[in-house]
């Protein structure tokens, strides 16, 4: 082979960008291959970063030395803390971005990174020999050799787009598909499956009746994702840096649903044209109308794609219905009666590789030096993809440098839970991360991501000494203040739900002056300490005992109080004989297993045999 690199990264979406940057920053000669340079790191669907559990992943990624958090901070236009009325463990940051500016910023980082070469090209085949990857062959016949190859192909493998009866090859509107790589993977012995995703129409901002809608302003107190943004702020650089935008809330109507039901026969989803399973937590509108037939309305959030962008993203209206049907149902929604569509919604089917074919490092079991990350592993979401890309990139680089892998435990990071669930349980639908998937979720909070993971980022060379020292200083400040509160008896008062750390210090001249993030972490540490310890003991007991708890044949899972419809569906389909078997069902959360175990111990919440057939 003529060209030679240490690492080749195939695909430069969110997973590929993080993987390529990690390898290059760790000193390896890295080639990033993409179908179009100008489409690298694009926010393909919603123009936002973060969200429930996703915000946790972004902060963890940043603590390890990743790029997504900083890139989002630079172009944020609408900041929101989700679950703000709930406990700190489930509170999550979501940042609406200037879509175009995000891609421009990430591309500037990629294209200027030392040790990283970005080149356009389609990988037609992998080259392997003796159980080890050797490189790739491009569509034009060019051969490139490498010691490691990372596949981060997103939704592009054998991708097919659907709008009503129309089909077009491509992984994203305006982009082609990766046509030959699936066959190459199969030839090497890999199993592939088929998933689908979708996106809503993009609306003309000027054609929306904003006065008829309910405004949804962002939070006035905003916290950046990245430690680097904080440092830059201390140096005088303002934050936020983009003008803010106000989103708006509307909803579908019975008329909307009637239009959808009358046209289901034109939906590729219900015609049988789409065989891939779609994401449970981001269903198409037509799917929602069928699955939740009794609901008369579904919320729709209208999100401008930038301060000056003419486009609006209607969250909640993903669809693959024909263009004429899309326009008709849009006009039945308040505020959208005269809306103009700039680009219609569509669905994408694509190949994925079941992730049980991977090691914990995301290296494939069959071919040494070959790594999979992102939607190729059956996940959905920018943040899940980015974290996997960083994880795979770090571990590929460490392997080539002869160093031990980076494998934080499930009690250290939501990202570790994500990877562990993927490689041990696999997926039967596009995987989305939730805090409930972690048995240690009380200690895995957004606010302490740096305290948990910064040492790992520094160890692998992605987090500079300055950043680690800042984190260590913050950690010491938290530890010392918690110890002082315990020593003086004030911790007992702070544990009361109605008492805050600020209230404890009122009128006390000797009260220490702490930064807001330190004071907040002190309060959370004190209030959560008992619960965290209790949860850890419960998790240990549960892990030891679950295989001993048998589930009666014909057990009515839908009678178990608190179980989600997803959990009931999975339990009913798999019919586990023990709680231990239930724990190993793909996608079943530790929270659901705990609820099931409690019900079985009580023996009163569900009859052993269902009185009526389950749906």
Swiss-Prot record:
Cofactor: FAD
Coiled coil: none
Protein's name according to its UniProt entry: tRNA uridine 5-carboxymethylaminomethyl modification enzyme MnmG
GO cellular component: cytosol
Keywords: Cytoplasm, FAD, Flavoprotein, NAD, tRNA processing
Signal sequence residues: none
A GO MF term: flavin adenine dinucleotide binding
Subunit architecture: Homodimer. Heterotetramer of two MnmE and two MnmG subunits.
Organism per entry: Myxococcus xanthus (strain DK1622)
One Pfam family this sequence matches: GIDA
């Amino acid at each position: 082979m003529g060209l030679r690199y240490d690492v080749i990264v195939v695909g430069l979406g969110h997973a590929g960008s993080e993987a390529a940057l990690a390898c290059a920053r760790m000193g390896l000669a890295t080639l990033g291959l993409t179908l179009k340079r100008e489409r690298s790191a694009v926010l393909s669907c919603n123009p936002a970063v973060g969200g429930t559990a996703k915000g946790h992943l972004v902060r963890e990624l940043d603590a390890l030395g990743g790029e997504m958090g900083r890139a989002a901070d630079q172009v944020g236009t609408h900041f929101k803390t989700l679950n703000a009325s709930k406990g700190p463990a489930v509170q999550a940051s979501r940042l609406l971005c200037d879509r175009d500016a995000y891609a421009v910023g990430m591309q500037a980082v990629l294209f200027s990174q030392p040790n990283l070469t970005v080149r356009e090209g389609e990988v037609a085949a992998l080259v392997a020999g003796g159980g080890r990857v050797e490189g790739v062959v491009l569509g034009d016949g060019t051969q490139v050799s490498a010691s490691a190859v990372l596949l981060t192909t997103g939704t592009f493998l054998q991708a097919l787009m659907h709008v009503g009866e129309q089909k077009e090859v491509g992984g994203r509107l305006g982009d082609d598909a990766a046509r030959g790589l699936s066959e190459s993977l199969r030839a090497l012995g890999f199993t592939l499956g088929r998933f689908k995703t979708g996106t809503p129409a993009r609306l003309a901002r000027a054609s929306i009746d904003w006065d008829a809608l309910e405004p949804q302003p962002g939070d006035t107190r905003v916290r950046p994702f990245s430690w680097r943004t904080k440092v830059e702020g201390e140096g005088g650089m303002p934050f936020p840096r983009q003008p803010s935008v106000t989103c708006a809330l509307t909803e579908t109507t019975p008329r909307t649903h009637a239009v959808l039901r009358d046209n289901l026969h034109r939906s590729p989803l219900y015609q049988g044209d789409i065989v891939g399973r779609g994401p449970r937590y981001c269903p198409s509108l037509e799917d929602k109308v069928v699955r939740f037939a009794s609901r008369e309305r579904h919320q729709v959030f209208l999100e401008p794609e930038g301060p000056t962008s003419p486009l609006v993203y209607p969250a909640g209206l993903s669809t693959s219905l024909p263009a004429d049907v899309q326009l008709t149902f849009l006009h039945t929604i308040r505020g959208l009666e005269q809306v103009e569509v700039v680009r219609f919604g569509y669905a994408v089917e694509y190949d994925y590789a079941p992730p049980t074919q991977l090691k914990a490092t995301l290296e494939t079991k069959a071919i040494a030096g070959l790594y999979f990350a992102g939607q190729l592993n059956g996940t959905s979401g920018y943040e899940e993809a980015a974290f996997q890309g960083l994880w795979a990139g770090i571990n590929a680089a460490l392997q080539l440098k002869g160093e031990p892998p980076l494998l934080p435990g499930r009690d250290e990071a939501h990202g570790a839970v994500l990877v562990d669930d993927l490689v041990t349980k696999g997926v039967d639908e596009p995987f989305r991360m939730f805090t409930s998937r972690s048995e240690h979720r009380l200690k895995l909070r957004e606010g302490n991501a740096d305290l948990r993971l910064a040492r790992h980022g520094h160890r692998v060379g992605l987090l500079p000494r300055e950043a680690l020292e800042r984190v260590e200083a913050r950690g010491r400040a938290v530890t010392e203040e918690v110890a002082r509160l315990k020593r003086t008896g004030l911790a007992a008062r702070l544990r009361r739900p109605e008492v805050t750390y600020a209230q404890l210090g009122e009128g006390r001249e000797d009260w220490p002056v702490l930064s807001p993030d330190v004071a907040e972490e002190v309060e959370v540490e004190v209030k959560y300490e008992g619960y965290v310890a209790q949860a850890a003991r419960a998790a240990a007991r549960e892990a030891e005992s679950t295989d001993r708890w048998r589930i009666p044949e014909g057990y009515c899972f839908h009678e178990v109080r608190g179980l989600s419809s997803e959990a009931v569906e999975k339990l009913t389909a798999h019919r586990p004989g023990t709680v231990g078997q239930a724990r190993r069902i793909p996608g079943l959360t530790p929270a659901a297993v705990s609820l099931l175990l409690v019900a079985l111990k009580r023996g009163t919440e569900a009859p052993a045999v269902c009185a009526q057939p389950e749906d």
